[in-house]
């Protein structure tokens, strides 16, 4: 039986105490590709909510696929391979700049919300997620940065090469979904990441 005190502590749980110097540098990064706007998202479901517990249980039932998670970890390289497959020109510097500047917004929101990662909530309930541990998973959970960046580049290249829209958007979704398969994100993190990507795409200069 979970005690009220424990539930209150769970609801107050955060990912950590704040941004590292490295992550703060990303938050302070100047912007040149996007309009100077303030982007907001709806808060994530509370840690003690039925929705969050349902998401944790959903993650616990996903079959492990380490290869899929690792293959989709490097966003810039993944899109480079798809360009190469279709013999399309790929400006790696441009892609890198979009990833760097989008990370400013991602990090701002991650540290604003400070949502715990799924394994932190799962541990409270005694649920073993058996997730994949990668260096790119060392930030607060909400929103998913991979979902944001995968969908952002997917939309940019779909606009540029509309005949390959299906393939670019599938790759963007694979990058986003790989973080769910790796148990690194809640499905609601992915949804918020896609919403952020759409806002960034719409506010390009």
What is the meaning of each model-derived region?
Residues 1-13, 202-205:
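Charge-dense, intrinsically disordered terminal/linker segments
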Residues 13-181:
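Hydrophobic alpha-helical bundle signature of multipass membrane enzymes
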Residues 157-160, 200, 204:
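Generic structural signal for hydrophobic core residues of well-folded globular domains
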Residues 174-202:
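Interfacial helix-loop-helix junctions of multi-pass membrane proteins
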